[in-house]
Amino acid sequence: MQNQQPSTLKEIRVHGTQDFPCAFYQTGTRIKGNMVKHHWHEEVELLYFSGGEFCLEVNMERFNISEECFYFINPGELHSISVEKNGGCVENAVVFHMDMLSSAYALDQIQTNLIQPVQNGSIQFPRCLRKNEPAFEPVRKSYEEIRNVFGGDSFRENYYDGEAVTDDITRQLFIKSTLLRILAVLSANNLFEVTEKNHDHRIETIKTTLTYIQENYKEKIYIRDPVSYTHSDAADDSLRV
């Protein structure tokens, strides 16, 4: 599923197509261990866990998952997924760039108060949606519609790993309108969050620190080394996260 750029942990791939940057993914395994390595990308990722036991890490914060739920990965966030027990585990994801929902010709409140703030990082998607939350069912319904438009029959086998994209304009219209519906549900439930002031700096420090460790894993590493590498005392804190 991934191609990584070792020096930055940024994923090198086109999600969807250049004209329609949106894709559907399914990843499954029966074996305990790492399933998706640490990486980041500029797109939003909506993860759906239908069951199984996972550990999702986002910016070095761990989330243990053992029941049906959604998780959102905001643009630029470092994340990975591991499976906690042997057995059948499957996760699905819709990955899309916010640019596909943006319009330079319609600077209405949707653009100025929602789309652009997500693009510039001043607000962000909620981290998680659980079954007991009012927004869960409408988001799940919309998510399943997107999955089916992408060709849901291709993903019926429990442990099939794959990617679906589309060049069909009618399918693209359905997908785009359904993504906007998900945003509307989140907005109606006041689930978009104001980004913490030090959020971007902390993420970049974590990325730089992990990059240093990755590039120097064969050598003995002292805390002062990545701190010096990042030119920031914040790296010291990141190593203890």
Predicted stretch roles:
Residues 229-236:
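Conserved small/polar residues in nucleotide/adenosyl-binding loops
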Residues 68, 237-238:
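Short hydrophobic/aromatic patch on the recognition helix
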Residues 60-72:
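Short acidic-glycine-tyrosine-enriched beta hairpin
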Residues 24-40:
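Conserved short histidine dyad/triad with adjacent acidic residue
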Residues 2-27, 78, 82-159:
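A hydrophobic/aromatic-rich effector-binding and dimerization subdomain
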Residues 125-137, 150-225:
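Short, Lys/Arg-enriched, Trp-marked, Pro/Gly-tolerant hinge/linker segments that flank
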Residues 40-55:
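Short, conserved beta-strand element in jelly-roll/cupin
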Residues 50, 66, 75:
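A cytosolic small-molecule/anion-sensing beta-strand core signal
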